[in-house]
Regions:
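Hydrophobic, proline/glycine-rich low-complexity stretches
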Residues: 1-82, 88, 208, 212, ...
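Non-catalytic linker/capping segments at the edges of enzyme domains
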Residues: 1-24, 91, 116-193
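Generic structural motif
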Residues: 4, 80-83, 227, 242-245
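Binding-site signature for planar aromatic cofactors or substrates
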Residues: 9, 28, 33-50, 95-123, ...
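A generic structural signal for short, non-catalytic loop/turn and secondary-structure boundary residues
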Residues: 53-58, 104, 178, 222, ...
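Generic beta-strand hydrophobic packing signal
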Residues: 63, 225-229, 273
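HotDog/MaoC-like acyl-thioester-processing domains
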Residues: 70-155, 235-237, 247-282
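Acidic/His-leaning functional-site neighborhoods
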Residues: 166-244, 250-256
Length: 282
């Protein structure tokens, strides 16, 4: 297992109107996962190639965010992120990141990745799993949390609100299908794609939050308490994405929703995003 801790001071890049920026922490933890892969694999830098020499990247398959209140963090607050990573399969790794401030855990981010490559140069629709037989690092049993994420991801990918018995998370049993809606977005090359020319995983969270805001424009924006994201595909530059809300709950506790993220050009589902938020003062 690989372990590391890094200190921070909350500034404008780390903060949003609702406290710590979820988008920032996703990107930061994503980079820490990437760097940890190199260290765990006994490499000086995160350069990976598959068995036939193609550039390979760690693509996230599942991410879980749990918070104790992003809004508690303020400008100039000191905090640290504690990272652990283990290899749980031939090309699969699992990491957990804990944001700690003043001895209190404010957020945890759990991430599962596998290595992928393109079978066609420049075509993000040709992304497939990569084989890296020479990858270093001991393989360990996945922790219970990882197993839970794998199981929920499998159930979510193959189910919908009409087949709720296949879904284990209690939230999904309370969503109402009368709120079905869609928002379309064109990913921007300057902000939504990463240096590997792939639609960045953190952009999926951003699209879902934009769809929520575009629909509701709450006077007091709610604060994320839990989010689960499962990724299945990517898009090419020029493709648009549809965020289709297939179930939603709005009550005195806050708002919750399950969104399919679809590639508009062929209708393929490229992600599921399940979100819970609470009202800021509740």
């Amino acid at each position: 297992m690989y372990l590391t801790t890094q200190g921070y001071r909350a500034g404008m890049p780390q903060l949003s109107l609702t406290g710590i920026s979820e988008n920032w922490i996703l990107k930061e933890c994503g980079q820490k996962h990437w760097d940890a892969l190199a260290s765990h694999g006994q490499r000086e830098r995160p350069d990976f190639f598959d068995d036939v020499g193609r550039r390979s990247y760690a693509a996230f398959t599942a991410i879980r965010v749990r918070t104790a209140g992003f809004e508690k963090m303020r400008e100039n607050d000191d905090f640290e992120i504690r990272t652990s990573l283990r290899r749980v399969g031939q090309a699969r790794h699992f990491s957990r990141h804990e944001l700690i401030s003043r001895g209190e855990e404010h957020c945890s981010v759990s991430m599962s990745s596998t290595f992928v490559t393109r079978s066609e140069v420049g075509n993000n629709r040709s992304i497939s799993r990569a084989t890296l037989t020479s990858l270093a690092g001991e393989i360990a049993d996945p922790p219970a949390e990882a197993a839970e994420m794998f199981a929920l991801g499998k159930a979510v990918r193959n189910s919908d609100l009409g087949n709720r018995e296949a879904i284990s998370r209690e939230l999904l049993l309370n969503l109402n299908t009368q709120y079905v809606s869609s928002c379309e977005f064109y990913p921007c090359p300057n902000g939504d794609f990463n240096g590997a020319d792939l639609l960045y995983f953190a952009s999926f969270q951003a699209f879902v939050d934009r769809a929520e805001w575009q629909t509701h424009k709450f006077k007091e924006p709610p604060v994320t308490t839990a989010r689960d994201m499962f990724f299945y595909g990517n898009v090419n530059l020029g493709d648009s994405v549809l965020v289709r809300t297939i179930g939603k709950r709005i009550d005195k506790r806050g708002i919750a929703h399950w969104c399919h993220v679809l590639r508009a050009s062929d209708g393929a589902k490229i992600a599921d995003v399940i979100t819970e938020k609470r009202w800021k003062n509740s």
